[in-house]
Amino acid sequence: MRKHIKNNVSWVGKIDWELQEFHGSDYSINNGSSQNAYLIEEEKTVLIDTVWKPHSTEFIDNLASEIDLNKIDFIVCNHGEVDHRGSLPALMEKIPNTPIYCTENAVKSLVGQYHHPELNFKTVKTGDSVDIGNGKSLVFVEMRMLHWPDSMATYMTGDNILFSNDAFGQHFAVEELWADKADQCRLWAEAMKYYANILNPFSPLVKAKVEEIQKLNLPIDIIATSHGAIWRENPLQIVEKYYEWSQAYQEDQITVVYDTMWDGTKKLAHKIADEIAKQSPDTRVKIFNISKTNKNDIMTEVFKSKAIAVGSPTVGNSVISSVAGWLDFLRELKFKNKKAAVFGTYGWSGESTKVLREELTKYGFSVVEPEIKCNWNPDADDFGKAEELVKALLA
């Protein structure tokens, strides 16, 4: 169960190969995940984080097989969300007086979720530290809104390990634990998906926090995340990526998304994609039916894109329900510095393109003037409008 990290630091978490969704069903998981917890055994014994409640019995039994639980001097709670803290109530039944180091906001979230205000909470803020012996300390750094107000990271001096909690992680099961041992294509794809769907709304805070960490000039040999692979070879590569991603990131890509009732909007979507490829052969084009593709995977492609084109038929004087739900998720992610175009079909009233234009404008997209609004099934004149629409997107 224990896996060696460095010197007297071990991983004691859970690799969850069968996990398929997260945050309820709001985040899709394609390659498993892990809940990473760590055990430090210096002059003081410290547990950093726990695992999700469904694995609590296994976690506590495995931990008890490694050490006497009563020898744990204190627990560090970097974040109060249940995937990191679900095993805490059961663990505290066995060691009820053990101090728990966390932020003031984490006390609120832990008490609110588990209703145990009597626990021995020790609140910390950025710059506070605890001596763990052998010339080493744990230094705490608040990471507010990365991605909860209660979040923090913990830095271990001497071994130069940053226990980064939800920052710099991925939902990705890696049996060997290490990022350099993982499939690199999947690793970076999952890291970007995680950022795009969870952290992108907080990009200004990410940028500021990365700059703060860089100014501290701390030697960092390992970034021990709370999910997925742990970074040891050039660990700052993921920090540098976060800094890049936090600044209205885009590639030379346009993503076309739509849903359709009787294939009219689908035909327009594919015509627009073909026209992009014709006018700008080097631009990567992706096309997705919103009702047939996972929303998190689509949003990762939107994150990478410099522009999007969104299409819907008119239904009930608005857009089709799948597009309406997708737009609401798009709103949450707060993308910046991206263009958009709208298109759609209708039989009678034809409001879908108007609704799309209004919503995308509200969400910060620069919506180009040309659009395709097609009555019934598209004909040659409708398809011909794709040329001007694409020119405007590429301008």
Map each language-model feature to its residues.
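Conserved beta-strand hairpin/beta-sheet module of binuclear metal-dependent hydrolase folds
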Residues: 2-65, 153-156, 160-164, 265
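Metallo-beta-lactamase
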Residues: 3-7, 102-151, 208-209
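Active-site neighborhood of phospho(di)ester-bond hydrolases with catalytic His/Asp-centered motifs
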Residues: 48-50, 72-80, 100-103, 162-165, ...
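Active-site metal-binding motif and surrounding structural segment of the metallo-beta-lactamase
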Residues: 54-101
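Short acidic active-site motifs
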Residues: 87, 293-298
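Active-site-proximal loop/helix segment associated with metal-binding centers of metalloenzymes
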Residues: 147-151, 159, 167-200, 246-250
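FMN-binding flavodoxin-like domain, especially the glycine-rich phosphate-binding loop
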Residues: 174-177, 184-223, 227-230, 271-286, ...
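Terminal amphipathic helices with adjacent charged low-complexity linkers/tails
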Residues: 225-251
